[in-house]
């Protein structure tokens, strides 16, 4: 992989982590259980996407 490709993947990982943190904050502010659950699900999905990209990056390096 080129340095540019690695940098791009790392940027995506950071973006997914940021989105996960934003969803966690939204879940804390949610006023009903359904909204809270949806934000927690989105948080987990974003965190999983970041984990998957990290694993891919480590396997390709």
Where are these regions (language model features)?
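Conserved catalytic/binding loops enriched for acidic/polar residues
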Residues: 4
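Short, charge-rich amphipathic interface segments used for partner binding and complex assembly
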Residues: 8-61
């Amino acid at each position: 992989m080129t340095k540019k490709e690695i940098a791009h993947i790392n940027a995506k990982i950071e973006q997914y982590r940021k989105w996960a943190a934003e969803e966690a904050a939204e879940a804390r502010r949610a006023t009903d259980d359904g909204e809270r659950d949806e934000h927690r699900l989105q948080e987990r999905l974003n965190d999983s996407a970041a984990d998957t990209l990290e694993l891919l990056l480590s396997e390709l390096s």
